[in-house]
């Protein structure tokens, strides 16, 4: 049995290495050993939120695992026979639902199945669920991947309680994604939400984002507002630009003492920054597409080459050898090109 050995402290050395490594192990059937997990972080080793994704992939692939405990700095994952399932991931806190899906989606794309995940939908240090639904899944659909995703309930820090359900069909036709630079913006859209808070919070976030986008661009702006109940209060906004290529996004979370207007402008400014580079994908999307691009092929212009992106490319190439060519420096716009897609 030949192991794929991954140094978990490489590059940005975070949970991304775990998510991509274990997902690729399930897809390829190759066992993976990850050592030095988060070695450069203040609290090294596996965190609870990483375990949720790993255990979901274990269930999906009937895997044998060793070292799957909080604080563990080495993990061995030996996948069994993967089969379509309904995977339930109950995160008791505000652990990120979208980060669990970053681990699950690449593997499930090859198998099919459905999922039900509770936890945080809109939490710091992870993509908001509306970004995943409207920006990431839009790009995946262009590559031939069909995912249905429904946000049943929001979950914010610290209590969580969000619920996201969905299903994914097996990836039949792998379509190369060619999207270097956008040429025109068709329109802007977005979702501004307030949970256990007054409706005016969502409305003010939306108004501020709408006004900021309209200062810079003439394309129409339609931002929906959503007011809901859950375990605890929270607010946030995701805005995206529909271009002739892909969608680029920007987002921001509300917090106590931060005016709703600041939240709305922050999301709009993040999107404007990405659009100004002229590239077809924002920095978060570029990074998220890597495991899928390896199989579909193509080339994508990203608004910023990030450490996350470079690390993710490195993990994919640990499994398949030279797959990508990355043009551009970290911190600058660049291009991601598949030189040898994996079949």
UniProtKB/Swiss-Prot annotation:
Q: Which reaction does it catalyse?
A: a 3'-end 3'-phospho-ribonucleotide-RNA + ATP = a 3'-end 2',3'-cyclophospho-ribonucleotide-RNA + AMP + diphosphate
Q: What CDD domains would the database entry show? A: RNA_Cyclase_Class_II
Reading the lineage from the top rank, the first entry is Archaea
List the EC numbers from the record.
6.5.1.4
* SUPFAM superfamilies, alphabetized: EPT/RTPC-like (SSF55205), RNA 3'-terminal phosphate cyclase, RPTC, insert domain (SSF52913)
Indicate which residues the UniProt annotation says bind ATP.
Answer: 102, 284-288
Pfam families membership: RTC (PF01137), RTC_insert (PF05189)
Identify the GO cellular component terms for this protein. Answer: cytoplasm
Q: What is its main location?
A: cytoplasm
* Compartment list: Cytoplasm
The UniProt record lists the keyword Nucleotide-binding = yes
Q: Give UniProt keywords alphabetically.
A: ATP-binding, Cytoplasm, Ligase, Nucleotide-binding
Q: Give the Gene Ontology MF terms in alphabetical order.
A: ATP binding; RNA-3'-phosphate cyclase activity
PANTHER family membership: RNA 3' TERMINAL PHOSPHATE CYCLASE, RNA 3'-TERMINAL PHOSPHATE CYCLASE
Q: What does this protein do?
A: Catalyzes the conversion of 3'-phosphate to a 2',3'-cyclic phosphodiester at the end of RNA. The mechanism of action of the enzyme occurs in 3 steps: (A) adenylation of the enzyme by ATP; (B) transfer of adenylate to an RNA-N3'P to produce RNA-N3'PP5'A; (C) and attack of the adjacent 2'-hydroxyl on the 3'-phosphorus in the diester linkage to produce the cyclic end product. The biological role of this enzyme is unknown but it is likely to function in some aspects of cellular RNA processing.
Tell me the protein's name. RNA 3'-terminal phosphate cyclase
Species per Swiss-Prot/TrEMBL record = Thermococcus kodakarensis (strain ATCC BAA-918 / JCM 12380 / KOD1)
């Amino acid at each position: 049995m030949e192991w794929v050995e991954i140094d978990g402290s490489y590059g940005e050395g975070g949970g991304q290495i775990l998510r991509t490594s274990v997902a690729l192990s399930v897809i390829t059937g190759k066992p993976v050993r990850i050592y030095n997990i988060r070695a450069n972080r203040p609290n090294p080793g596996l965190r609870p939120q990483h375990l949720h994704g790993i255990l979901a992939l274990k269930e999906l692939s009937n895997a044998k695992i060793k070292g799957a405990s909080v604080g563990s700095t080495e993990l061995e994952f030996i996948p069994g026979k993967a089969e379509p399932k309904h995977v339930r991931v109950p995160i008791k806190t505000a652990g990120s639902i979208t980060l669990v899906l970053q681990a699950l989606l690449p593997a499930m794309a090859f198998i099919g199945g459905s999922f039900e995940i509770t936890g945080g939908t809109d939490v710091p240090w992870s993509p908001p669920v509306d970004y995943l639904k409207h920006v990431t899944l839009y790009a995946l659909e262009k590559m031939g991947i069909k995912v249905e995703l429904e946000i049943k309930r929001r979950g914010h820090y610290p209590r969580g309680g969000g619920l996201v359900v969905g299903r994914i069909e097996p990836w039949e036709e792998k379509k190369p994604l060619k999207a270097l630079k956008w040429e025109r913006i068709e329109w802007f859209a977005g979702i501004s939400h307030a949970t256990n808070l007054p409706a005016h919070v969502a409305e003010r976030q939306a108004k501020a984002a709408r006004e900021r986008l309209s200062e810079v661009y003439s394309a129409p702006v339609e931002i929906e507002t959503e007011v809901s109940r859950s375990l605890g209060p929270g607010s946030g906004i995701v805005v995206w630009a529909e271009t002739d290529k892909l969608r680029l996004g920007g987002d921001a979370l509300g917090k106590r003492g931060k005016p709703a207007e600041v939240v709305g402008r922050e999301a709009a400014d993040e999107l404007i920054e990405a659009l100004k580079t002229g590239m077809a994908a924002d920095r978060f999307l570029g990074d998220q597409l890597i495991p899928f691009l390896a199989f579909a092929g193509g080339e994508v212009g990203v608004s910023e080459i990030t450490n996350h992106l470079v690390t993710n490319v490195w993990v994919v190439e640990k499994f398949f050898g030279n797959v990508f060519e990355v043009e551009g420096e970290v911190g600058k716009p660049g291009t991601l090109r598949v030189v040898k897609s994996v079949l």
